[in-house]
């Protein structure tokens, strides 16, 4: 009997230690999920802002290029590449135009208030899919986590609070001591894996061309330079030169 008590005592001590470890990992996980969600939202806002500023200009530049190539194909009717490139330029112009329609009225910055960040952490610590002990529970948590990320991206505090009401976390006390220990150890492994995945996702995000452009533009703005407008000015100059080229080609064609 004493040996059984001793084993249970050791399990209880181990469970207590693992729960402390798990509590710390939950905090880390919530913080990292918040960091990732914030980074994605900030980049999404920037992409819409960038597209809203330069998208129409790129579309116009491609339309002008298509006109140039169209005229060139008339000068050289046997040159198939001119017609193909003209069609490609028109398609690219249409794509830029469609993308711009989808990104109208972008918010300049993504600035979630501190109360929203705290609420995100609180909810994420409770519902995160990597705390699941079964496939069904994991799926349910995944749905709620998706709702949380979407609401956070919209800065919608009122949409986040009902997620807590919807969630009813099972109590560990309903399991035997040994089962509780196994469950917590499994959760720890899952959370550590997810933390590594988040670090990888953040690193991949920072290596994208759009993220690096955002960093450069943000850095320039802090120094009082509007780099985005400078990019737009460069495109505008290209458009002017291309239009001049069209006039010259059209004149030659008439001659």
Feature locations, PLM:
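C-terminal accessory/regulatory regions appended to core domains
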Residues: 1-255
């Amino acid at each position: 009997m004493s040996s059984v008590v001793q084993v249970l005592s050791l399990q209880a001590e181990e469970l207590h230690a693992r729960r402390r470890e798990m509590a710390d990992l939950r905090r880390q996980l919530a913080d990292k999920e918040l960091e990732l969600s914030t980074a994605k939202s900030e980049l999404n806002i920037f992409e819409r802002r960038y597209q809203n500023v330069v998208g129409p200009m790129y579309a116009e530049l491609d339309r002008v290029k298509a006109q140039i190539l169209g005229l060139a194909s008339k000068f050289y009717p046997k040159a198939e590449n001119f017609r193909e490139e003209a069609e490609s330029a028109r398609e690219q112009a249409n794509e830029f135009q469609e993308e711009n329609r989808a990104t109208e009225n972008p918010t300049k910055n993504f600035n979630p208030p501190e109360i929203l960040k705290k609420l995100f952490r609180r909810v994420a610590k409770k519902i995160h899919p990597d705390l699941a002990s079964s496939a069904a529970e994991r799926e349910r948590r995944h749905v709620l986590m998706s709702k949380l990320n979407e609401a956070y991206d919209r800065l919608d505090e009122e949409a986040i609070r009902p997620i807590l009401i919807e969630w009813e976390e099972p109590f560990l006390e309903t399991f035997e001591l040994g089962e509780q220990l196994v469950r917590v150890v499994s959760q720890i492994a899952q959370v550590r894996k997810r933390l590594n995945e988040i670090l990888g996702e953040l690193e991949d995000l920072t290596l994208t061309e759009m993220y690096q452009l955002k960093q450069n533009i943000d850095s320039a703005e802090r120094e009082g330079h509007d780099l985005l407008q400078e990019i737009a000015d460069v495109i505008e100059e290209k458009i002017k030169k291309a239009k001049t080229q069209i006039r010259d080609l059209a004149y030659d064609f008439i001659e």
